[in-house]
């Protein structure tokens, strides 16, 4: 008797979770100041895109590669590696189609940092990372992903225990923004987009990843514990130091 409404509820929840940017009128979402929403209007290429711009499809293998790299780092940090404190409740990150759709639209501007807002009805203040490539020849998508991850991974030399407890974008030895965002315990989802183009003799690419949350200056990157995942309802089977993807963490709630 109760199976029908329960099934209907689950279906509605799945539709909401995996909604794409095409299903929402982003022109109606509020943006700070005079900024425009990246999802508002037609997603045309900008003049900065040079010749032959092309937005690339991130296949399942690419999405899995991104998730694997991010969750590996989160699992590593959560257990107290690199001299960082143990994370009490950091969860496995999942792919989100809506964040990916907005990231894809962002890459069509062919400029890394912009003032366009990217908030959604579910994610009020998403974080964003941009990786720009320039070279004689365009590498494979997997190689672009690996290069982007390596850039963030190198920031382990810059991030400190003090930054985990009191976030700022720069440590004593340099930038920590990419790594700090990847290990935020309020991040629950990520979605990425990729556009490539030709600029004279140079091949260029912009890989953008939107995260469900962003770090706030002066606030903790994650909550510290005595043992990894001590505040999780249960532990993930693959990433032993993380909560599973089902852990009910609110990405809009500040630490």
From Swiss-Prot:
It is found in: Secreted. The keyword tRNA processing does not apply. SMART domains: SCP (SM00198). Residues 67-211 form the SCP domain. Its main location: secreted. CDD domains: CAP_euk (cd05380). One of its GO terms (cellular component) is extracellular region. Residues 1-23 form the signal peptide. Expressed in salivary glands. A motif (Cell attachment site) lies at residues 32-34. It holds the Pfam family CAP. Leukotriene E4 binds at residues 82, 153, 156. Keywords: Disulfide bond, Hemostasis impairing toxin, Platelet aggregation inhibiting toxin, Secreted, Signal, Toxin. GO terms for molecular function: toxin activity. The keyword Secreted applies. InterPro entries: CAP_dom, CAP_sf, P14a_insect. Disulfide bonds join 27-40, 31-117, 49-110, 192-209, 232-243. Anti-inflammatory scavenger of eicosanoids and antithrombotic protein that inhibits platelets aggregation induced by collagen, ADP and convulxin (GPVI agonist). Exhibits high affinity binding for glycoprotein IIb-IIIa receptor (ITGA2B/ITGB3) and endothelial cell alphaVbeta3 (ITGAV/ITGB3) integrins, but not for alpha-5/beta-1 or alpha-2/beta-1. Accordingly, it blocks endothelial cell adhesion to vitronectin (IC(50)~1 nM) and marginally to fibronectin (IC(50)~1 uM), but not to collagen. Belongs to the CRISP family. This is Tablysin 15. It comes from Tabanus yao.
């Amino acid at each position: 008797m109760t199976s029908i409404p329960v099934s209907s509820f689950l279906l509605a929840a799945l539709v909401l979770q995996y909604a794409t940017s095409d299903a929402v009128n982003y022109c109606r979402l509020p943006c700070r100041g005079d900024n425009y929403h990246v999802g508002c209007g037609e997603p045309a290429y900008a003049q900065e895109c040079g010749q032959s711009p092309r937005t690339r499809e991130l296949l399942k293998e690419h999405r899995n590669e991104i998730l694997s790299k991010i969750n590996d780092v989160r699992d590593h940090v959560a257990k107290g590696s690199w001299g960082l404190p143990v994370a009490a409740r950091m969860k496995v990150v999942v792919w989100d189609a809506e964040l990916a759709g907005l990231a894809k639209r962002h890459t069509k501007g062919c400029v890394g940092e912009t003032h366009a807002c990217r908030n959604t009805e579910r994610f009020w203040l998403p974080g964003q990372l941009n990786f720009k490539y320039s070279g004689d020849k365009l590498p494979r998508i997997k190689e672009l992903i690996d290069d982007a991850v390596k850039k963030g991974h190198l920031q382990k030399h810059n991030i400190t225990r003090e930054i985990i407890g009191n976030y700022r974008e720069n440590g004593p030895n340099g930038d920590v923004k990419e790594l700090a965002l990847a290990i935020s315990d309020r991040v629950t989802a990520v979605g990425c987009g990729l556009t490539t183009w030709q600029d004279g003799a140079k091949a260029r690419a912009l890989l953008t990843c939107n995260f469900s949350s962003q770090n706030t200056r002066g606030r903790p990157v994650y909550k510290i514990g005595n043992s990894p995942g001590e505040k999780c309802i249960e532990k993930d089977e693959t990433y032993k130091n993380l909560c599973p993807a089902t852990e009910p963490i609110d990405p809009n709630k500040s630490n």
